[in-house]
Design a protein with these regions (language model features):
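A short beta-alpha structural unit
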Residues: 225-232, 248, 277-299, 313-323, ...
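Divalent metal-coordination and catalytic microenvironments
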Residues: 16, 68, 88, 113, ...
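Zn-dependent metallopeptidase/amidohydrolase metal-coordination segment
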Residues: 310-367
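Non-cysteine beta-strand/loop elements that form the S-adenosyl-L-methionine
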Residues: 67-69, 144, 168-171, 333-338
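Histidine/acidic-residue-rich, glycine-tolerant segments that coordinate divalent metal ions
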Residues: 56-57, 73-85, 89-90, 105-228, ...
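Oxyanion-binding "anion nests"
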Residues: 228, 235-279
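Acidic/His- and Gly-rich active-site-bordering loop/insert found
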Residues: 1-85, 89-109
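Buried hydrophobic packing segments
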Residues: 33, 94-102, 191-199, 363-367
Length: 368
């Protein structure tokens, strides 16, 4: 990578880092991205779609089309203020670095540079669907930085790369009574506690081996994490009527996430004689799946270009909304190791600029 371009990109990454914006609120971030492109590059068309943007050189319909995607939203830290604790400022800088390096070069492909919002809550990829309605996309690539993997090594997997997941907020409404007469009410605490105990085995599933849970068979990892639970309020005279439990359901395979969902919904449907039941869904993420044929061809290219690559032994348990794009084109998602450093979403996390040249080079190789 040209030193001049690297210096521009690092400086801009630091600007983004100082102006973090959470999912669905990244207006100023996109303004900065757009200004950087217009100020430093003349060969690209910039398509501002209000909630997202993409760039490309003039489209040539006779060519195949590749999409390179980067996210740009931030998260909240423990002080409840936005910060770039997942490195999306770095992902954006990497994509801009590829654009700088490729500006004067010809390609046999149409290359679309997609700047996606709102990855953290799972809504951003779907927001960008009009891009895939407008263009026939032949391949799409994405990446994520990864602390505590060897620095500047490209990590990959065919098939499942990251898990599918969804959040559920379940509320129960029974009947309130005096705390001295709990038998005259319907307190949801026991129903919620029984459910929490029932799913305890699913909270301990950490591996990707087949297993059976209550006559449901899973071929790989499936788990439920209780992230919040609440009943009543701090009032010693009341046996409460209201309670809620919030869950993250997660599975390596989308069809097996559906099995978890059926189990949870069936469990609470069975409580409707005693309680009013509400189930709301949040933050749905598709399985992040890498097309095996595309992976094989791409890894051969990366090795030939001198990049160090390593196959992950198993998928990452976390989710990434890049998985949505497999609906439209063969996709591949990789990780760039950052070496020993604080983990993603940790308050002390900072993106490491030293992986930018490797990541830019990797993207340049895949579009050749």
């Amino acid at each position: 990578m040209k030193q001049e371009n690297l210096e521009k990109i690092i400086a801009f990454r630091h600007v983004l880092h100082e102006h973090p914006e959470v999912s669905n609120h990244e207006e100023y971030t996109r303004k900065l991205i757009k200004e950087f492109i217009l100020n430093h590059m003349k060969s690209y068309l910039v398509f501002d779609e209000k909630d997202w943007l993409y760039c490309m050189k003039p489209y040539q319909p006779e060519k195949k089309t590749i999409v390179l995607r980067a996210d740009h939203d931030a998260i909240m830290n423990s002080l409840n203020t936005p910060f770039h604790g997942c490195g999306h400022d770095g992902h954006t800088a990497i994509l801009l670095g590829v654009m700088l390096e490729e500006e004067k070069k010809e390609s046999e492909y149409n290359i679309i540079y997609l700047f996606q919002p709102a990855e953290e809550n799972g809504s951003g990829a779907a927001i960008c669907k009009p891009l895939f309605d407008k263009y026939h996309v032949d391949k799409i690539f994405g990446l994520h930085n990864m602390p505590n993997l060897r620095k500047n090594v490209i990590y990959y997997r065919p098939e499942t790369v990251m898990c599918a997941s969804v959040g559920y907020r379940i509320t129960l409404l029974g009947v309130q009574s005096h705390a001295s007469e709990p038998e005259k009410g319907r307190n949801p605490v026991y129903a919620l506690s029984a459910f929490a105990k029932a799913i305890e085995p699913l909270a301990k599933q950490t591996g990707f081996q087949p297993f059976t849970f209550k006559n449901y068979h899973f071929s790989s990892l499936a788990m439920i994490t209780i992230i919040h639970m609440n009943v009543g309020s701090l009032n010693f005279g009341i046996s409460p009527a209201n309670g809620e439990i919030c869950l993250t359901l997660r599975a390596a395979k989308e069809n097996e996430l559906s099995i978890l969902e059926r189990y949870v919904r069936s469990y609470f449907e069975g409580l409707k004689e005693k309680f009013e039941v509400s189930i709301k869904e949040f933050d749905r993420f598709d399985e992040n799946y890498a097309d095996p044929s595309l992976v094989e061809k791409t890894i051969m290219k990366l090795k030939s270009a001198g990049l160090e690559v390593e196959q992950l032994s198993e998928p990452i348990r976390a989710s990434e909304d890049f998985g949505y794009y497999k609906r439209f084109a063969p996709s591949m998602f990789v990780f760039v190791g950052m070496g020993a450093c604080p983990s993603l979403h940790h308050d002390s996390y900072v993106f490491d600029d030293e992986i930018i040249p490797t990541a830019v080079h990797m993207f340049q190789v895949v579009i050749r």
